[in-house]
């Protein structure tokens, strides 16, 4: 086992990365090795899918499936070895199918097949018990004994960035949004990484290519969400519970939430969001359901306690999943799509009757709690509508600075930085927030500036697209570049979606971003220096010192 993709990976003066019987996330060495085999096999799939486009061979089924399978290897998504084996076996079947199609088409048009990469020749045995023996060939740090650590680090930056983009591609696909040009670019990059490249400049350029591709993917996902559910509107959400039977929906998949709301109408079941599903309340086509009762709990790292105390059924639609056996709620948990845990019921299709039956069999909440409201729904359209008023307040000197404080949450004590930072931000500043990092401070009171709330919840992690649109609009209004705006990004990272959003911001030319709580373990000192020199990336220190530096600029 070797895994170094998330923030909680082992980091000591002598060891970087999880390489023992179990990772810090709870992933076993077996699952980790199987995921490596799957990823390397997917690189082979992309070799033939990319080559196929030169021969007019496009397999839509493969295009739509491959990013989904890649998503299954993202942090805290799928811990079930049987499911990973299924993905791996399917990838091998697709690779063989594509190879046959491409070779046949190449013969017809006289196209010469280039030299095959190792990934293109990576064949899986029919006996699944033999898959683990291939793990050394597929390890994400393969070649580390002969390659410079900077090369390995950049390969991983690209791999993890592309993995984050693949997750957003799958979220968009579920909502009917696909683009052949993006599929082609995804396969091109994935196939390139399967060649084990060693040119530093080429790898750096590829990381920027991934960032720009992800910008288009986030735009696509934004369209899918707003076309399907309407544009988010500022909406108050109750973060306390109501008496009655209940279902909790966690993850990111708004499609699943809608289906659950439709199927629970009139059944006396309250539906609650959790974690990154909180922004769902801002969408008119979801908020119209009166039994969408509120948001329960906070960020992912608290779920074992919060889920254990939830007296109903729980549906995990995407990341982040933790071991449900710790809180003894595995019998009330259902996984969807790419999510998996051994022994937990997995649902395919759109029939949630098993979830409903489970919810009705539980006692539910016994009484109503006193309501506590927070506001969400400041998505792209709402921000654009508010832009003229915001500009006016800036011109009048009432708003002097904007902070975007968000990203992934986690359980390290250093993450209290983000709570303290927002609390100490000047009262003439506006704070935009997104992703689950918001739970560090979104129940605090920030007041308003002449009717403009000082805290604006933009949405899920992918809604960084909305924040970017606001920054572009403000830069146009003030006739300056984004980096000249009184705007500072203070981001927290945990997994691969955060990595690709950072690459997107870099690719768009955004500089001076503060990141934390720690640097990714796969980035060497040399690579961190490159990011500091090229993009003015800064590591967080203390809220007091960072605010002093920011406001003095």
Swiss-Prot record:
- Protein name as annotated: Hydroxylamine reductase
Pfam families from the UniProt entry: Prismane (PF03063)
Q: Name one GO molecular function term.
A: 2 iron, 2 sulfur cluster binding
Tell me the Gene3D superfamilies matching this sequence. 1.20.1270.20, 3.40.50.2030
* Record GO cellular component, one term: cytoplasm
**What does this protein's UniProt record list under function?**
Catalyzes the reduction of hydroxylamine to form NH(3) and H(2)O.
What InterPro entries does UniProt report for this protein, alphabetically? HCP/CODH, Hydroxylam_reduct, Prismane-like_a/b-sand, Prismane-like_sf, Prismane_a-bundle
What subcellular locations does the record give? Cytoplasm
Q: Which family does the similarity line name? A: Belongs to the HCP family.
Q: Summarize where hybrid [4Fe-2O-2S] cluster binds, as residue positions.
A: 252, 276, 320, 408, 436, 461, 495, 497
The record's EC number reads 1.7.99.1
The cofactor named in the record is: [2Fe-2S] cluster; hybrid [4Fe-2O-2S] cluster
| Positions where Cysteine persulfide occurs in the chain | 408
Q: Which residues bind [2Fe-2S] cluster?
A: 3, 6, 18, 25
Reactions catalysed = A + NH4(+) + H2O = hydroxylamine + AH2 + H(+)
Swiss-Prot/TrEMBL keywords: 2Fe-2S, Cytoplasm, Iron, Iron-sulfur, Metal-binding, Oxidoreductase
> Where is this protein chiefly located?
cytoplasm
On cofactor binding, the record's note says: Binds 1 [2Fe-2S] cluster.
């Amino acid at each position: 086992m070797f895994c170094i993709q998330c923030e909680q990976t082992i980091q000591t003066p002598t060891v970087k990365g999880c390489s023992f019987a179990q990772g810090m996330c709870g992933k076993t060495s077996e699952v980790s090795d199987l995921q490596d085999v799957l990823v390397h096999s997917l690189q082979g799939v992309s070799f033939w899918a990319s080559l196929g486009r030169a021969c007019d061979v496009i397999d839509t089924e493969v295009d739509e499936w491959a990013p989904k399978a890649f998503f299954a290897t993202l942090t805290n998504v799928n811990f079930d070895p049987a499911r990973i084996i299924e993905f791996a076996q399917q990838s091998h079947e697709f690779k063989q199918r594509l190879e046959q199609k491409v070779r046949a088409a190449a013969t017809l048009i006289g196209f010469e097949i280039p030299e095959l990469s190792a990934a293109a020749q990576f064949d899986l045995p029919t006996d699944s018990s033999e898959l683990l023996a291939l793990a050394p060939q597929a390890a994400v740090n393969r070649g580390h004994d002969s390659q410079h650590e900077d090369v390995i680090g950049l390969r991983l930056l690209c791999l993890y960035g592309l993995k984050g983009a693949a997750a957003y591609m799958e979220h968009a696909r579920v909502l009917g949004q696909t683009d052949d040009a993006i599929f082609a670019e995804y396969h091109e990059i994935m196939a390139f990484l399967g060649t084990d490249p060693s040119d530093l400049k080429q790898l750096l350029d590829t990381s920027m290519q991934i960032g720009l591709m992800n910008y288009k993917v986030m735009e696509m996902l934004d369209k899918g969400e707003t076309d399907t559910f309407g544009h988010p509107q500022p909406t108050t959400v109750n973060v306390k519970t109501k008496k009655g039977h209940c279902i909790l929906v966690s993850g990111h998949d708004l499609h699943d939430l809608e289906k659950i709301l439709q199927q629970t109408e009139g059944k006396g079941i309250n539906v609650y969001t959790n974690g990154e599903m909180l922004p769902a309340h801002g969408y008119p086509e979801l908020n119209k359901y009166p039994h969408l009762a509120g948001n329960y709990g906070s960020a992912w790292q608290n779920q074992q306690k919060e889920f254990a105390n939830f007296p109903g059924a729980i549906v995990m639609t995407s990341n982040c999943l933790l071991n449900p056996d710790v809180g003894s709620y595995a019998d009330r948990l259902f996984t969807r799509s790419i999510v998996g845990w051994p022994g937990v019921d997995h649902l395919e299709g759109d029939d949630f009757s098993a979830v409903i039956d489970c919810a009705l069999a539980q006692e539910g909440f016994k009484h109503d709690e006193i309501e506590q409201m927070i506001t969400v729904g400041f998505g792209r359209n709402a921000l654009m509508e508010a832009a003229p008023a915001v500009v006016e307040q800036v011109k009048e000197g009432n708003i002097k600075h904007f902070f975007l404080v968000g990203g992934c949450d986690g359980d390290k004590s250093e993450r209290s930085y983000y709570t303290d930072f927002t609390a100490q931000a000047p009262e003439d500043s506006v704070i935009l927030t997104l992703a689950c990092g918001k739970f560090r401070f979104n129940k605090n009171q920030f007041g308003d500036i002449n009717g403009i709330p000082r805290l604006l919840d933009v949405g899920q992690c992918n809604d960084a697209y909305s924040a970017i649109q606001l920054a572009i609009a403000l830069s146009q209004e003030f006739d300056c570049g984004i980096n000249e705006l009184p705007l500072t990004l203070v981001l927290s990272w945990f997994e691969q979606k955060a990595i690709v959003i950072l690459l997107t911001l870099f690719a768009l030319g955004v500089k001076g971003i503060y990141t934390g709580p720690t640097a990714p373990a796969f980035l060497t000192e040399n690579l961190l220096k490159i990011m500091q020199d090229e993009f003015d990336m800064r590591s967080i220190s203390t809220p007091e010192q960072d605010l002093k530096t920011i406001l003095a600029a």
